[in-house]
Design a protein with these regions (language model features):
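A residue-level marker of the well-folded mature domains of exported/periplasmic proteins
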Residues: 1-227
Length: 227
């Protein structure tokens, strides 16, 4: 797991372990380690697992861009590899298919997630969202991690849903919150302090950052969906 302190991944690893036990795996044969949000640490952990001769590796990469390096190590050891939650890029996935490797990715479609975010704004209608009446939707974007493919897709497709619907948009601020609630809270608080009532929409790449944004909005005396 890329980082144990991530609330979502805490739930994920708990459910994953429970499911494996339900399927008949011995808990003693399941080892889950904390990558501590450091790719070098995680790569070392993977090297250790390979040396120990594990039967399968499930990897939630710290950096999706490191997938090729991880894949090469694991494939060379002839160990099945499953990536979860953080999707490697399309070129890397195509490499698995071209070579017939026992490697796959399991996770949600981040393009769809981003589109759903944007469509929620579209469904509200311009009259509701365009609080300052200038005919544009001004937004603040809080990204999880610019190197993470899921973050890239959610960022791109949330805004694309607005422009595809014919809405004019203006990005007031695009900052990295590293998936963390406290960082997102500070980013949104700063944006509200700088842009005030001009901020009409806040997009966040995950739930934790959305909660941080909510706290900042409430602290600024504004109400989500109203002002």
């Amino acid at each position: 797991i890329y980082q144990f302190s991530d609330n979502f991944m805490t739930l994920f690893r708990t459910e994953l372990e429970n499911y494996l036990v339900e399927q008949g795996f011995s808990k003693d044969n399941i080892t889950i380690v904390d990558g501590a949000n450091d790719q070098a640490t995680q790569t070392g952990q993977i090297d250790n697992f390979i040396s120990e001769g594990v039967d399968v590796l499930i990897v939630n990469p710290v950096n999706s861009s490191s997938a090729a390096t991880i894949t090469d190590k694991v494939v060379a050891a002839d160990i099945p590899l499953v990536y979860i939650n953080r999707e490697p890029d399309a070129e890397e996935e195509q490499r698995w298919e071209d070579n017939g490797w026992n490697v796959t990715y399991v996770g949600c479609d981040a393009r769809q997630s981003g589109t759903f975010q944007g469509e929620m704004i579209v469904d509200l209608g311009l009259d509701t969202v365009d609080l300052n009446g200038d005919g544009k939707i001004q937004y603040v974007m809080v990204e999880g991690d610019p190197e993470n493919v899921d973050a890239q897709y959610r960022t791109e497709y949330s805004v694309k849903a607005l422009t595809d619907a014919g809405l004019e948009v203006e990005c007031l601020s695009d900052q990295v919150g590293n998936w963390q609630q406290d960082q997102a809270q500070q980013i949104v608080a700063n944006a509200l302090g700088q842009y005030g009532d001009k901020v009409e929409v806040v997009f966040c790449n995950n739930d934790a950052m959305a909660l941080g944004a909510l706290q900042a909005i409430q602290s600024a005396g504004r109400t989500v969906g109203t002002d």
